[in-house]
A protein has these predicted regions:
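Short, strongly hydrophobic alpha-helical membrane anchors
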Residues: 1-3
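Phosphate-binding loop of NTP-binding sites
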Residues: 5-214
Length: 214
């Protein structure tokens, strides 16, 4: 590889790592379920004709990149700002930089860098790194999948302790499920029940098992 190709490889890798900002938000909001990052990505691509067009253009540029070294840099910049509508910055609540989110992000970084190292050492130039950039959502899903059992085992003591405390007290427990407005529904219901009962509400938007247990 010449210096231009190596520089391109490094820039692509940095761009792919930067994409973690977007995937972190989705991962946390969807309770770190493997596969949901890709699901949301394709949902946004299908939802707008502009996103479908941009995806088509980037795929064409990937072919062009076989002949022009700087094209992958353009692709990595495009992928930072797309899909349109699924922005890097949260429109509602901010991403909570928890230890779990940091761990899965570090795992993502490791996978991205590993792909780039393989791309270099196996003689593929920057092409494997470019593929990782195009499918960074899939790589983040793999990081979630790799960390899933570890996180499950790590959270089990907290969940078991919380379950014992609840079971040792003869009090009614209300759980609210759904895709949207769980926190709003929880707060409204708590306000109603508080008129004639002592009510304890889980703080803020901690709606997953570990968040509630802690």
């Amino acid at each position: 590889m010449n210096l231009i190709s190596i520089a391109t490889l490094v820039i692509i890798t940095i761009g792919t790592c930067f994409n973690a900002i977007r995937w972190q938000r989705i991962a946390q909001r969807e309770h770190y379920i493997p596969g949901y990052i890709s699901k949301f990505y394709f949902r946004w691509v299908r939802s707008r004709g502009l996103n479908r067009f941009i995806l088509f253009i980037t795929l064409v540029l990937c072919i062009v990149s076989l002949f022009i070294a700087y094209i992958p840099i353009i692709i990595s910049v495009i992928n930072i700002y797309t899909p349109v509508g699924l922005s890097l910055k949260s429109r509602t609540s901010k991403v909570d930089k928890t230890e779990r989110l940091n761990r899965v992000t570090y795992c993502y970084y490791f996978l991205v860098v590993l792909v780039s190292i393989f791309s270099y050492t196996l003689g593929y130039g920057y092409f494997l790194a470019l593929a990782a950039n195009m499918f960074s959502f899939f790589i983040f899903d793999q990081a979630l999948r790799l960390m899933f059992n570890y996180e499950k085992n790590k959270s089990r003591p907290f969940i078991n302790d919380a379950s014992k405390k609840l079971n040792s007290n003869a009090i009614p427990v209300i759980g609210i499920t759904g895709s949207y407005s769980k926190t709003t529904t929880k707060n409204v219901l708590a306000k109603i029940l508080d008129e004639s009962n002592n009510v304890f509400v889980t703080p803020e938007s901690y709606n997953n098992r570990l968040g509630i247990a802690k």
